[in-house]
Amino acid sequence: MRLILLAGLMLSVLAAHAQGVSGTVVGRSNDGKEESIIGAVVLWEGTRSGTVTDASGHYRIGVPPGAKRLIFQSINFVSDTLEYSGQTTIDVTLREATIDMGAVNVEGERSATYINSRDPQQFQVLNEKELCKAACCNLSESFETNASVDAAYADAITGTRQIRMLGLEGKYTQILFDNIPAVRGLSSTYGLTYVPGPWVKNIYITKGVGSISSGYESMAGQINVALKNPDTAERFHLNAYAGSGGRTELNLVVGPKKAEEHEEHEGHEDHEEEEEHEHHEHHQHIKGSLLAHAAMSQLRTDMNEDGFLDNPLFSNLSLRNEWHFDGHSGLGAQVALNYQNINTVSGQLDYNPTDEIRSQLWGVNTRTRRYEASTKVGYVFPDKPWKSFGSQFNALYHDQEGDYGFQSYNGEQRSGRVNLLFASRILNESNTFTTGFSYVFDDYRDTLTSNFPLIVNNPPYALSRQERIPGVFFEYTLNARDKFTMVVGLREDFHNVYGALFTPRLHARYSINDHMTLKVVGGMGYRTAVLVMDNVGMLASNRFIVIDGDQAPSNKYYGLDIEKSRNAGLVFTWKGDIRYRPATLSIDGFITNFESQVVVDYETPGYVYFYNLQGRSFSNSAQAELQWSPIRRFDIRMAYRWLEARTEYREGLRDRPLVNRHRAFTNLAFETRKKANGSQWRFDATVQWISRKRIPFVISNHGEHDKEPLSSWSDDYWQVMAQVTYVFKTNLELYVGGENLTNFMVHDAIVMGNETSSSLFDGSLLWGPVFGRMGYVGLRWML
């Protein structure tokens, strides 16, 4: 019955920019009062496609092919330009212009990170200003100044960084690059390191389940990374970085020559567009961008004096080439190509895989090659901008080899994805929908060999597998002006092994008044486990790996269930003024319950078990965050987050390992007034407190059990990071910074580190930093 309902609603074909955008334009006066703006101009940058807000400040506009930036303008208010990456709702608050009559300069303010309170999804936006507050060498390091996402090392040896949202590992967060699912499969842990920070334009962080048009895999959250492209890339951007840990980087962004500034577009009335259309020939426009990244580190350091490298030695080359085609009559296309070549070495301090003697030491040597291509094609009806078709096509090949001490891993992934969408409205602009079809193909071929053998209770189970998943979906949006917005999504997928997967989701927003908003989020999510790469930190040990799936004959991969969860959240947002200065308070709570899960059990020393959940597994999260600008150019962001993440192990219901229950966070940012030549100083500091974490039962470095009968707890600790940037002029910046300024280190991060041939050798239970105080310097040059 569900299939009949969805198939009847689905109109098939095509998507990337396949839906309209609606929202409200609000003006905020200097005394803090807000009211909707009537007649505000809303238009797409570089086009003549625009509209104006109605008597309620509301607008709706179609999305032309290649559209990336939406401009908002109104008399007596500072214009604003927002990035578009597939949102259905974009709301904006324009500030009353502050005019210096002597210099005739108009100044506006824009936060480095902000919460969109008018979109029914609860998402936070991190822009380039926020990303520049830290070194942000790659995407996995871009969340150091964010309270909603935890970033930590997966183990004490490989240097792999992973994220957590709502107390759950990053594998439960769907990560998109330009609205295309990207970090999944064999890249589920390493994938965030594949994207250099200077390539990123914006990051959109969604707590809870995301839109069903992107698939069923978002369980704890969704992160959409908007990469620089031909529409948003600088004409030339060079970023050079060097750190005291031996890491050096060079990043290059090259974009097309920019068109005329959008301020020159005036009087974009519809009748003018029609008249000019009769006298101008249709034209086509092709533009491209190139993103390049090269990095390496060959400095051997051991600051915590445990005999192992603090950070891996590595070399990395990444390239991205993207082309946009903007045709006439509403047709457009985008093509992007990606390449990564990454090599890493870590382990004992003198380990060298190419040396006959030193290669006998315990070490890790990995080699990764990744090729990816994606295409988007869209069509918007010229006379019906609210009606559009679109398509996304994505293909990748991922090849990874690795020696991990006594174990060797080889993995290949061949994946393809098609997403076809149609968007339109029902009766009027308040009722819109998006429907479509998707097909996902994954072919995994991975093997793990070891002197400490892989143990599988039923030998026919193999690590290699193939997934074929067609699916259909329908998403309805009700937008009752500025008061209430609701998005209801239904999705049905058909997995070749796990059968039908039904995914309902709901996002609703209610505006209590001009300052307070309430949101409700709920839905389901699924994923199939990729045992080795989901848990690559376990290879930083000599643990025996035991896959203990169902004993009865089954087609399930490894005899393990598909992971299935239900997520619900409630979000309250207040936007107003404190002492006549803008402030935002956000309070949220989320509950995630697993109906089925692959439990990863480290509770027995020397072993790691994989088995189906037999009992409860859940995560409860609550967070409060305050953003305030007490004076112009000075921002304060404070947050507190509480977590309760527990799973039923064979030993009973216990806290999930290495998850801190409490985290307190403060970020301070100040910049001086710009001089006539554009020069200024910028200062940023972040302080955070991380509470203790549960460490699974281990053997001490002296070969004796810990004093506590089943587990131990880490210490809590503080971390401080800071950065100073000097802007010589508008296109040249020098920055100097430091991380872990408290110099806190874990000195016993590796269990039995002096007995690397023991089955009890274990570097997989890292709970804090192993590298002490670190300084860095960098340069940004933009044209």
Label each residue range with its predicted role.
Residues 284, 390-394, 398-401, 511, ...:
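Membrane-embedded beta-barrel scaffold of Gram-negative outer-membrane proteins
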Residues 297-318, 324-389, 395-415:
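Flexible loop and strand-edge segments within Gram-negative outer membrane beta-barrel domains
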Residues 89-93, 139-142, 161-164, 176, ...:
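N-terminal periplasmic accessory domains that precede
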Residues 585-593, 612-698:
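Gram-negative outer-membrane beta-barrel transporters
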Residues 59-62, 180-208, 319:
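Short acidic/polar hinge/loop motifs at secondary-structure boundaries
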Residues 689-703, 725-783:
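C-terminal beta-signal and adjacent terminal beta-strands/loops
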Residues 140-184, 201:
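Extracytoplasmic beta-strand/coil segments of soluble accessory domains associated
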Residues 30-32, 38-45, 73-77, 87-132, ...:
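Short, acidic, small-residue-rich periplasmic hinge/interaction motif at the N-terminus
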